[in-house]
Design a protein with these regions (language model features):
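Conserved alpha/beta cores of soluble small-molecule-handling proteins
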Residues: 1-110
Length: 110
């Protein structure tokens, strides 16, 4: 298994200890949109603070979406996600309620 930078990951990672609580990672996925424009292609970047305008809707009006995902390693060594299509549906419903552009399912599946 490799990171987004192509570095080999530590194979001793204890996948069975993962929970549905916050699990800090080395990277995070970032994507953006403005107004009614479609979502831009996302990217993996090192985990850390994100730059944000003081006028951001999430700060002024509480308009924001977040969806976490859980991954598992199979007995054959593959990494699989736990119901990513459900994550996509929840985020699409949330975007609709907040009058934001829907997040494409491909963000979660591809």
């Amino acid at each position: 298994m490799f990171t987004s930078e192509g570095k080999a990951m530590d194979e001793s990672f204890d996948w069975d200890s993962l929970t549905f609580s916050l699990t800090p990672t080395e990277t995070m996925y970032i994507t953006e949109t403005e107004g009614d424009a479609p979502w831009m292609p996302g990217r993996l970047q090192p985990y850390g603070d994100i730059p944000m305008s003081p006028a951001a809707g999430v700060l002024n009006y509480g308009q924001g979406l977040f969806e976490g995902m859980k991954a598992f390693r199979t007995t054959k060594g593959r990494i699989v996600f736990f119901r990513p299509e459900e994550n996509a549906r929840r985020m699409q419903r949330g975007a609709d309620r907040l009058k934001m552009p829907p997040v494409p399912e491909s963000v979660f599946i591809d």
